[in-house]
Design a protein with these regions (language model features):
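Alpha-helical transition-metal enzyme core signature, strongest for iron centers
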Residues: 14-21, 43-57, 80-84, 88-105, ...
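A glycine-rich beta-turn/hairpin centered on an aromatic-Pro dipeptide
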Residues: 161-194
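Acidic/His-leaning functional-site neighborhoods
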Residues: 184-218, 222
């Protein structure tokens, strides 16, 4: 069974993915090139989102439980420059602000988050976990925009499946379709079960084999493809599906309340 990433690993991987993002932006022929996986955005827009977003979350984590919403940084400091060297430095500073705030907070500081009804705690550690996936998926977006998409690193993707299910899917919002049990299986050897019902959705990591006939459907793929599917970058057809695929299609359409 793969381990849950601890804060030092999360910070290391955020830094690694942010560095990979900066490399794409630095070498891209045209920052006005569209990002197909983020309709309506250019690479410049994506860079603005990554930089300003990390600064905003840094300020939110620093404020801790006193924050009543996501803290917005100074507009002038949160605006990405167009000149390449200045943009690279601005992105690096944005990442460093986030890493410094998370490191200072530690994993357990109470923190405002947009998720309030999920299984993920409202803590600095949960923010770090989600920020890793935010940067990792947007790095893939940038790579895909220049025609060079690279699968998410194994340890990032394995944590990403569980993080997405716990934060973005597991909720007390009622599942609007027929109750179902879904198992996501990563070809790297990990699996997660998602129970969907009128009481909401609950996710859990599976420690052993799933008994035959237990889930209504099992969807298998690499952990990277599972994460990219969950974030809407890849279609359901990327999965090797065993069982009734309707719950998988329903999950793509479902937008549970936060």
């Amino acid at each position: 069974m793969h381990p849950t990433l601890e804060l030092p690993d999360l910070l290391r991987l955020i830094d690694e993915r942010a560095t990979a993002f900066r490399a794409v932006i630095a070498s891209a022929p045209d920052l006005d090139a569209p990002v197909p996986s983020c309709p309506g955005w250019t690479l410049a827009d994506l860079a603005q989102h990554i930089g300003a977003g990390r600064r905003s979350w840094a300020a939110t984590v620093a404020l801790g439980a006193a924050a009543t919403g996501r803290v917005q940084p100074d507009p002038e400091e949160a605006t990405a420059p167009r000149e390449r060297a200045a943009l690279d430095a601005w992105l690096a500073t944005s990442t460093q602000q986030l890493l410094d705030a998370l490191r200072e907070a530690g994993p357990d500081r109470p923190c405002w988050t947009w998720w309030t009804r999920s299984q993920s705690p409202q803590s600095s550690g949960a923010v770090a976990r989600h920020q890793l996936q935010e940067v990792a998926v947007h790095t893939w977006d940038a790579q895909a925009a220049v025609g060079e998409p690279v699968p998410l690193p194994r340890e990032v993707a394995l944590d990403g499946v569980e993080e997405f299910l716990s934060t973005c899917v597991a909720t007390t919002s009622p599942w609007p379709y027929e109750s179902a049990t879904v198992v996501y299986r990563a070809t790297e050897g990990a699996a997660w079960r998602l129970q969907l019902s009128a009481e909401g959705a609950r996710a859990e990591r599976l420690a052993g084999a799933v008994r035959a006939g237990q889930p209504d459907v099992t969807g298998s793929a690499t952990a990277s493809d599972l994460v990219l599917l969950m974030y809407g970058r890849l279609p359901v057809d990327v999965l090797d599906i065993d069982g009734d695929r309707r719950p998988l299609d329903g999950l793509v359409e479902w937008e549970p309340e936060d």
